Amino acid sequence: EQDADTKRPPASVTKIMTMLLIFDAVESKKISLEDKVPVSEFAASMGGSQVFLETGETQTVDTMLKCISIASANDACVAMAEYISGSEEAFVQEMNKRAKALGMHNTNFVNCNGLDAQGHVTTARDIALMSRELITKYPQIHEYAMTWMENITHETKKGTSEFGLTNTNKLVRQYEYATGLKTGSTGEAKFCVSATGKKDDVELIAVVMAADTSKERFADAVKMMNYGFGKCQVYSDEKPMKTKYAVVKNGVEENIEVERGEKFTYLDVKGKDMKKIKKIEKINKKILAPVRKGDVVGSIVYTLDGNEIGRSDIIAKRGVQKAGFSDYLIKVSAKFLIGEKN
């Protein structure tokens, strides 16, 4: 880590937030990947990296995402911003709101594509935060970001033509563990990249800003990820529990079978012996009906060298209803009959 909180212009790495808001809009069903997005005169006028969209042309949201993630298209960014929020200015307000919610305290966006503008700044740490949000919430971004070449079709008044997209992220072809994510470069920002990679179960993000050359930014990103992969190891446990029961009070049944919830994952960066991890299953003693399937009724506690490193929920395998008056009568009658037989 070096100068992680120094404010700098991010160039097209800005588009990570733009794509995050696009996926947010898709998830909320405000838009769909099949929607046709019109291109305004303003969007078509964007300089820098572009796919030469023309005024009045339409492209699907899916195609616009390809243009942004693969070719870093400034014109596609503005077209999407206008489609989602009505104007780039309104969209940028949403970008800053999303950034604040993610804890990106040293970030201020002025536009949606990263062209040099006064006050348009972020930090390496903040870029890592928005990158993590994008890849964890919308892992499908990797399909876009890892596409090396793709063709799109322009349909305009001039006719139909093909346009080739080539990925600006050379790590896609040069680094075996690469999974994305976004490059950027301008005269003011120099060369930037938010690189993501995965090896075994370890996923890393390496952010480089203000490198002097394109080659340098990629070399630095690879160096950081190789260092991270060498230091990090993952312990995961999703082994099913042996059959166990929890005692339920005031229920139509006195016992309920339990099971583990989600798998447990622990990331170690200190070279600890993961074989020394121990786990203890703790089922709550006071469980009152009603109990719903999936309710948390205990936890699996994981420790390493005597220190707790995390927990995983133990949940009810099925539900148990609260006992009513008739249920108590049946129980009392059953006990009475058993007593008479004895």
Language-model-detected regions and their locations in the chain:
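Active-site-adjacent loops and short helices of periplasmic peptidoglycan-processing enzymes
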Residues: E1-P139
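Domain-terminus/edge residues, biased toward the C-terminal soluble/receptor-binding domains
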Residues: M104-H105, D116-V121, R125-N342
